[in-house]
């Protein structure tokens, strides 16, 4: 070939290559980046997962925060720790883009639920292990799905965009919390003290699982959460069940009867006024629910359930109603430690999930009023002998003051439509939901940062969130990087 012609062909090839690279969409850039670096990325993610992150270990929580600040700075992002006495630090990073019209805030959390190593396969929750399950690769470790995956996906998406030469178009903020699993008791105070830093046009809350169908999900609200701890009393100390059975009241039985009367056979709560005040869904929200996949039968098979509550209503409908759940019961002993005894006390922890229109304090009070209506004298501290002997039934009810209300962002806001289009550019089929089943302190975020919140999760629904053998499908991680790249590219 003529040297001049060869040179011209090379020039044309390079020009076309440059055009192709320039035409790359953010999700395409993320896909190519993760495909080229998968082994390295899994190793890096494993390193992040190796640092313990439970509330009882503040030194390691600080290690997590310091590492994340370093990761942001390594990418040229101005970052710092936002601190409050007695609370884990919030990791904050910001990118300002000249001429940008909007500011987008990405929220995630780096803390995790407590662990019991003996319940984990291999016995080590902080040693990440990749296993193949039904031809899918999953990485197992505490916070693999909830919520270090979101942080790692954001960092990786930033790397992918930089590698592809795709310039950012909006101001970006990163807010990564360290006590979400403890109920975020200090988040609002930290954000309020730094309002000028954390304000944005929208907060993208990157937490939770995608739809059970596996489709990417965008959620516009979250249930609120309130807790009550109920203790009922019998004898001052355990009594021999043969000598005193049929005579001494058994608090375990008393509590079981009290709790059983709170619901009917279909699971509907019978506490008076429990459903009062619910703000109805809008027309667009009802339409979104009607289009969402119905996964009930699949979930029944996955969870080995022979029946479900709800009187025939689908799970997605029931998520938009308040609920009453028993988190745990405690009285006496079972198994090899069981004794023939009438226990002195019985305790239950109640979890009240809330929807928009119901205040958490009012919902707690409705349950307390119901307990009174069943003949109990209610106290908020350990009762003395006089109280126990003056009243036939005594219940100590402790309110969790770290509770919070539900929040819902309208789906038809301009910023909401922009988020939907960005996510669709990465994932095509997207499930839109008015409310997620879980609870996130969105109200604290919206009040303190004076903003709106939209949740974009990336974890698989069966990630064993909050339990032993927590895991993340690696494909969810790669898909999540593409989704984050699309959101980081918003203008």
Description of each model-found segment:
Residues 44, 54-102, 125-128, 422:
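A non-catalytic alpha/beta surface segment that caps or lines the substrate-entry region
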Residues 8-20:
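Bacterial N-terminal signal peptides
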Residues 24-25, 211, 227-471, 475, ...:
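Metal-dependent amide/peptide-bond hydrolase catalytic core
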Residues 25-59, 66:
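N-terminal capping segment at the start of a domain
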Residues 101-176, 479:
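Active-site metal-coordination/substrate-binding segment of hydrolases
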Residues 54-56, 86, 99, 110-114, ...:
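Solvent-exposed loop/turn segments at secondary-structure junctions
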Residues 166-248:
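Histidine/acidic-residue-rich, glycine-tolerant segments that coordinate divalent metal ions
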Residues 46, 50-54, 73-77, 159, ...:
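Sec-exported extracytoplasmic/periplasmic mature domains
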